[in-house]
A protein has these predicted regions:
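A short alpha-helical cap/connector motif
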Residues: 2-241, 245-269, 273-383
Length: 383
């Protein structure tokens, strides 16, 4: 299956090369980005020669030294060789200082290196020089997230939960390109649900221990058509991750449906529970960096389900909610679903980040602390 994915990534590079020749640079480099990000995953699995060949295919297709340097910097960025990436993009800028996308990559590399003032200056200059370039505004949100939530990103925290719990069963709602689903360990039966991405042809990642079971359905249709116990081959799941439709009412439905198959010590993780700014939490997407209004689920659960243990881990880019002490027999949320949705949709997202931290029940981004709450090594009640 990994060879299939590497072959698919090779074809994606060829498609991006064609787009680039046709003049569609945005689509071309969007495609390159996805490929280079995925290649780092496979390089980490020991497929260094194969990933290098795919990277070379993209590099050799570049029509000028400037574009070759840009592409090289992008590869180094995704391999996390940030100092070398900065050197490459600075060399490209020396050749073509008027190209906005070069400055944008420079700002991203500066962010990764921890030079937040330098990155802020870079993106601010882009906004002044090229107001039509929407990526600068989104990058400023990323910068703010880096400042407010330093340290590991949510993929790192997902990996921690897999390491702590070593789940026999893992259910993921909303797959993206498959990166989080591929974190499942060798003894985990992984199940992925997504109406658009629930096909191997649309994913870029596959678990090295064996492919997950995919369901190309909405989560509502999945739970209506399938008994999760039969799909898992067991009565309960160990770890669930909700990252589907970014609307409060859907996240709440997904939580209700998952909890019916939970044990008390099962854990449900919910992405996008700490928006970096109110505008990214709008119900209708108006920014590239977007969380939707999933944040509402945290105060909702705190109010209607005081029996649950809940916290939001302040991890970039948009927080990770974590819930345990679950009760499969509880019907409180389902019984009051309409009134809950009506009430919580009337609330505004707090303007200040410190206010959002309180409303979203933000805890400490400390591995020992979080493990103590959600992996059973202690019996904390202080959340």
């Amino acid at each position: 299956m990994i060879n299939y994915m590497l072959g698919k990534l090779t074809e994606q590079v060829r498609e991006s090369v064609t787009l680039q020749k046709d003049g569609d640079l945005a689509a071309a480099f969007g495609g390159y980005e996805l490929v280079f990000e995925a290649l780092r995953f496979y390089e980490g699995l020991g497929y260094g020669k194969e990933t290098e060949n795919i990277q070379r295919l993209a590099l050799e297709a570049q029509p000028s030294p400037m574009m070759t340097l840009y592409c090289h910097s992008l590869i180094l960025f995704h391999r996390r060789h940030y100092t070398c990436a900065l050197e490459a993009i600075e060399a490209a800028l020396a050749v073509a200082p008027e190209i906005t996308m070069l400055h944008a990559l420079r700002g991203r590399v500066q962010t990764a290196l921890g030079d937040l003032p330098g990155a802020y200056e870079t993106f601010s200059q882009i906004q002044s020089r090229d107001p039509a370039f929407g990526g600068a505004a989104d990058s400023l949100f990323v910068l703010t997230a880096e400042k407010e939530m330093p340290g590991e990103d949510y993929y790192d925290w997902l990996q921690h939960f897999h390491n702590w719990l070593r789940p026999a069963s893992y259910v993921e709602i909303g797959l993206g390109h498959g990166r989080s689903l591929a974190l499942a360990g060798p003894d985990t039966k992984a199940i992925g649900v997504d109406p658009y991405q629930g096909f191997w042809g649309r994913l870029n990642y596959v678990c090295p221990h064996g492919p997950a079971t995919l369901f190309p359905l909405t989560s509502d249709d999945f739970f209506a058509q399938y008994d999760l116990r039969e799909v898992m081959g067991r009565e309960t799941f160990d770890l669930g991750f909700i990252d589907g439709l970014h609307l409060f009412e859907q996240a709440l439905k997904d939580f209700i449906n998952l909890e019916r198959y939970a044990r008390k010590d099962s854990v449900i993780l919910i992405h996008d529970c700490l928006p970096i700014a109110p505008v990214v939490a709008e119900r209708e997407r108006c920014t590239g960096f977007w969380t939707g209004d999933v944040w509402r689920i945290i105060p909702c659960l705190k109010t209607f389900r005081p029996d649950l243990k809940i916290m939001t881990i302040p991890t970039k880019p948009s927080g990770l909610g974590a819930v345990t002490n679950l009760d499969a027999a509880s019907t409180v949320l389902a019984d009051h679903y309409d009134e809950i949705v009506h009430y919580y949709l009337s609330l505004n997202c707090p303007e200040r980040f410190d206010q959002r931290r309180v409303v979203c029940n933000v805890g400490i981004a400390d591995e020992d602390y979080v493990q103590g709450i959600f992996a059973g090594s202690t019996n904390r009640t202080d959340i």
